[in-house]
Amino acid sequence: MKYLFAGGGTGGHIYPAIAIAKEILKNEKNAQILFVGTKKGLENELVPREGFELKTITVQGFKRKLSLDTLKTIYKAMVGLKEANNILNEFKPDVVIGTGGYVCGPVLMMAALKGIPTLIHEQNAFPGLTNKVLSRFVKVVAVSFEESVKYFKNKEKVVVTGNPIRRELLKVTKEEGLKNLGFYSDKPLIVSVGGSRGAEKINFTMVEFLKQKDKNLQVLIITGANQYEKVLEKVKTETIDIDETVKIIPYCHNMQDVYAAADIIICRAGAITLAEITAKGVASILIPSPYVANNHQEYNARVLEKAGASYVILEKDLTAEKLYKKIKYLLDNPQVLSKMRDNAQKISKIDAAEKIYKLIKSIT
């Protein structure tokens, strides 16, 4: 069978598609898989690295105000529809799967008009506009959170599957993770992750936190590449002594080690990050990004908070003092920390890729 994936822009739209594609190949060795994305998205790096073919089309998001840019966007949308149509005619997929991003619009719309079976996957608790529109035309809507169902009009099409994750994340033990990262096994490890682009408020708050931290506490700050030098400069300016219990790095390619080793993780609330930390049962303090569409990260974070798997601190309320108090409370009350871990695993859906694969087969 031939499978076409449309998704791109950010890792949050691409990683689920890759996970589903790998699940397909696990079950069908001879399956043909093609990815369609944009020319500037992260898919240009991630998809070929995983060994999949990628084709790109012209597309960009619509501005809400009428302007010259809006007219340009409409023109690009028409071009994108034509390019999507050409790819569909050439590849002749048996099914088309959309995992988010502007590229899904023209590809899924053309596929639906041609009568090709279609499925979309929504990663966030609050669905994006593109997926809400496409839900009227596709055969199945897979969602990651039970809370998402109410936002779709055609609820009979909606199936809760969870977010597909990379299976390698589950294979590393805590001892292996600590060893691989170069930390001691007899001291708690606090990890902060700002995401690939970094989060200045989280990073700078963590630098302030270092002034208060206990000597028996280990800290890993993953700054994001574009924030790394700023953070080092702030550490220098604040004259903070960094010993072997503290590591500050720009990026980590082996997040399976990080999730396995962390006692508490401080991070944003992107859907894929949350799927990964719940799968590993990591207690978390979530700082939702206020800079995303529809405030969807706070919606995601509140799901974990409601389940007792996380504490949520809004960025505007984040201080080193508040962070220190939360962390100290959790470390001083191991039964609470253990309960958070258990609650995280209870809401995880590690079989999401398998569920989505079965859904795909049910419509083809």
UniProtKB/Swiss-Prot annotation:
UniProt cross-references to NCBIfam families, sorted A to Z: murG (TIGR01133)
An MF annotation (GO) of this entry: UDP-N-acetyl-D-glucosamine:N-acetylmuramoyl-L-alanyl-D-glutamyl-meso-2,6-diaminopimelyl-D-alanyl-D-alanine-diphosphoundecaprenol 4-beta-N-acetylglucosaminlytransferase activity
A single BP term in Gene Ontology: peptidoglycan biosynthetic process
Entry's Gene Ontology cellular component terms: plasma membrane
Species name: Thermoanaerobacter pseudethanolicus (strain ATCC 33223 / 39E) (Clostridium thermohydrosulfuricum)
Gene from which this protein is expressed: murG
Binding site for UDP-N-acetyl-alpha-D-glucosamine: T10, G11, G12, N124, R166, S196, Q297
InterPro entries tied to this protein: GlcNAc_MurG, Glyco_trans_28_C, GlycoTrans_28_N
Catalytic activity of the protein: di-trans,octa-cis-undecaprenyl diphospho-N-acetyl-alpha-D-muramoyl-L-alanyl-D-glutamyl-meso-2,6-diaminopimeloyl-D-alanyl-D-alanine + UDP-N-acetyl-alpha-D-glucosamine = di-trans,octa-cis-undecaprenyl diphospho-[N-acetyl-alpha-D-glucosaminyl-(1->4)]-N-acetyl-alpha-D-muramoyl-L-alanyl-D-glutamyl-meso-2,6-diaminopimeloyl-D-alanyl-D-alanine + UDP + H(+)
Protein name: UDP-N-acetylglucosamine--N-acetylmuramyl-(pentapeptide) pyrophosphoryl-undecaprenol N-acetylglucosamine transferase
Subcellular location: Cell membrane
Entry keywords, A to Z: Cell cycle, Cell division, Cell membrane, Cell shape, Cell wall biogenesis/degradation, Glycosyltransferase, Membrane, Peptidoglycan synthesis, Transferase
Highest taxon of the lineage: Bacteria
Function: Cell wall formation. Catalyzes the transfer of a GlcNAc subunit on undecaprenyl-pyrophosphoryl-MurNAc-pentapeptide (lipid intermediate I) to form undecaprenyl-pyrophosphoryl-MurNAc-(pentapeptide)GlcNAc (lipid intermediate II).
Location, primary (coarse class): membrane
